[in-house]
Amino acid sequence: KAATLRESRNMLTQKCMGYLSTATVLLDFSALADGQRGGLFCTGSLYNGIGISREEGKNYLYLEKNGDVQQVKMVSGKKIYLRVMLDAKKNRCQLFYSFDNRNFILCGDAYSLKFGDWKGARVGLYSYNTLGIGGKCYFDWFNYDFN
């Protein structure tokens, strides 16, 4: 159980490399439990992520910006592609989603990582439940490209 992404214990991370990088993941959210959230995040000293949350049996695309959660839209189906694009020179990140892995839709505003966490900037996958224990989040594949 965790209240926010930063408190989640279920994370798998990759240190950011290069000046320009893109991380993309295929998320199968068919087995989420109520209160569960799963997705893709990017962190420096702030934790920002995009993912799916299940609330009262319904699935929502949502953004989490350093603990503040914003529902974007209700989604149907079982799978979604999530992407984060990073520009280290400009200290800028952007989050995207797609249902076909071709047409990615910008989700939320670009933001700065505010580097400062001792681990450095990282991208990663996460899953946590705000109500208790339970549910599953399947990450089919993860791709990380950088220059």
Model-derived features: positions:
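Extracellular glycan-recognition regions
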Residues: 1-147
